[in-house]
Amino acid sequence: MLVITTTDDSGDSRTRRLARLDSDGRIYVSAHHWPRAWYRRAIDNPEVRVEIDGVESDFVAVPVTGEEFGRVAAEFPLPLPVRFLMGFPPPREILRLDPAT
């Protein structure tokens, strides 16, 4: 798990606890359920703050597409029972969290 802090255009910050997906030495998060405001804020303002194991760091949220999306989605599938419990959510979106430089 991790805690991501995203900021909207007015400068208001919000935090959200998300599942941490570790793949190929990188950190990913997935928007696969109805509460997606955090995802929209990260797309609009990709500089995010992330807490992992009690340590906060700055990251840049990068939308994942193509082959990389397919690989990560296949590595962390959403089983049918989970999708059913979520009410068959909208299509999944994945962000890669790159360390800010």
Label the model's feature ranges.
Residues 24, 33-101:
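Short, structured beta-strand-loop surface elements
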Residues 1-34, 48, 60:
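Short beta-strand segments
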